[in-house]
From Swiss-Prot:
Function of the protein: Required to regulate peristaltic movement and also for germline proliferation in males and females.
Protein name as catalogued: Protein slowmo
Family: Belongs to the slowmo family.
Compartment annotation: Mitochondrion
Organism: Drosophila melanogaster (Fruit fly)
Gene label: slmo
Domain PRELI/MSF1: 1-170
Keyword terms, alphabetized: Developmental protein, Differentiation, Mitochondrion, Oogenesis, Spermatogenesis
Organ and tissue specificity: Expressed in specific tissues such as the developing central nervous system (CNS) and both the male and female germline. In the CNS, it is restricted in a subset of cells during embryogenesis and early larval development. In embryos, it is also expressed in salivary glands. In the testis, expressed in somatic cyst cells throughout the distal region where the mitotic cysts develop, extending through to meiotic cysts.
Length: 215
């Protein structure tokens, strides 16, 4: 059994990072993750519970095919909880494919940085166990190395999604500013038109009154 752990600090608040975590896949940094499907989602005592199925591609060396078999597509089960009051997001993932010989249990914790609330601390832990096949320790090292590499790509992917979200927010803000500007301009135009109409009516009334007085 191999245990891998890692910590990373995002220079973004917890709300932004967790929002990006839901939209993390697909992204160009982790093309091995094909997509996710929501199996179940419910809220219990203010905590969001979600069960998703993750579809991915794992590229094992050819020499492992005779030991564990082959699969073009791999599946994993992801169960998560999000507590907005305590600002905690926990994701637990375990593999479904190759589960007769391989067990990969991964846990991710997202929480505000203890000394800087404007940042988010990510803690990751993966437990890898290979059993029932030769060279199990070597395969555990191989899988652990792959997990470490993919974790780095995953963090890059999350930053990419955060950038996308920030761009969307700026676009919405810009659109709102344009809408307010156009609305103000329309109101000014209507006000000016009404003022001119009132001036014309007043002028015509004065002209008519003057004509009646002369007559």
């Amino acid at each position: 059994m191999k245990i891998w752990t890692s910590e990373h600090i995002f220079n973004h608040p917890w709300e932004t990072v967790t929002q990006a975590a839901w939209r993390k896949y697909p992204n160009p940094m982790t093309p091995s993750i094909i997509g996710t499907d929501v199996v179940e989602r419910r809220v219990v005592d203010g905590v969001l519970h979600t069960h998703r199925l993750v579809q991915s591609k794992w590229y094992f060396p050819k020499w492992t095919h005779a030991l564990i078999g082959t699969a073009k597509t791999c599946f994993a089960s992801e169960r998560s909880t999000v507590d907005p009051e305590r600002k905690q997001m926990v994701l637990k993932t375990n593999n479904l494919t190759f589960c007769r010989n391989i067990s990969v249990d991964e846990v991710l914790y997202y929480e505000p940085h203890p000394s800087d609330a404007s940042k988010t601390l990510l803690k990751q832990e993966a437990t890898v166990t290979v059993f029932g096949v030769p060279l199990s320790h070597y395969m555990e090292d191989l899988l652990t190395s792959t997990i470490s590499t993919n974790a780095g790509k995953g963090r890059q992917g999350l930053e990419w999604v955060i950038g996308l979200i920030n761009t969307e927010v700026k676009g919405i803000a810009r659109g709102t500013d344009e809408l307010l500007h156009n609305t103000r301009r329309s109101i000014d135009e209507v006000t000016e038109s009404a003022r001119k109409s009132m001036d014309e009516i007043s002028a015509q009334a004065a002209k008519a009154a003057k004509a009646m007085h002369i007559t």
